[in-house]
A protein has these predicted regions:
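Non-catalytic terminal extensions that flank enzyme cores
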Residues: 1-158
Length: 158
């Protein structure tokens, strides 16, 4: 049996964790930035982004990748990807944000988990997403039910 590690999906391991030097540089800024408190599901997604489990993603999908995954099950660069990895936020929070703005993603206890630079904001067509990704609109399907009933109506890429 080989001890070699398989190559990450897409050929590149993305693990966008801050090193100690960068963490010290942004530490003071964190208190000044707008914050979003992550849901349990969002926290799982950001952990997989940060530890490389969602390589080659280095953040939440932008609208182009989201649309491509919903239509073709592939990222915009044509790499196979089965489901959108998105950050849904409330409209009221989205209204306060600008493209290229940095925000802090926090856990429920208020600890800063990640910094996100807003690449884009959009209102997804969740019915279309459910149909293309889950191939059903039946809310007995847990993915469809969660998407249609528990996600906010604005997605943010970054």
């Amino acid at each position: 049996m080989s001890n070699s590690i398989i190559k990450p999906h897409g050929g590149k391991l993305c693990s966008p964790m801050l090193n100690k030097k960068h963490l010290r540089e942004v530490n003071n800024d964190i208190l000044q930035l707008k914050s979003w408190t992550l849901t349990d599901r969002q926290l799982c997604d950001i952990e997989l982004i940060l530890n490389g489990g969602f390589s080659p993603l280095d953040g939440f999908m932008n609208q182009d990748d989201y649309n491509s995954v919903c239509e073709k099950n592939r990222l915009k660069n044509n790499l196979l990807w089965p489901i959108p990895i998105t950050l849904d936020i409330s409209n009221s929070f989205a209204d306060k944000l600008d493209t290229n703005e940095k925000i802090v993603l926090r856990d429920k206890e208020g600890f800063a988990i990640a910094l996100l630079t807003v690449s884009d904001l959009w209102h997804p067509e969740k019915d279309k997403e459910a149909h293309h990704i889950y191939e059903t609109m039946d809310t007995n399907h847990p993915g469809v039910n969660f998407l249609l009933n528990d996600t906010h109506s604005t997605y943010i890429g970054g």
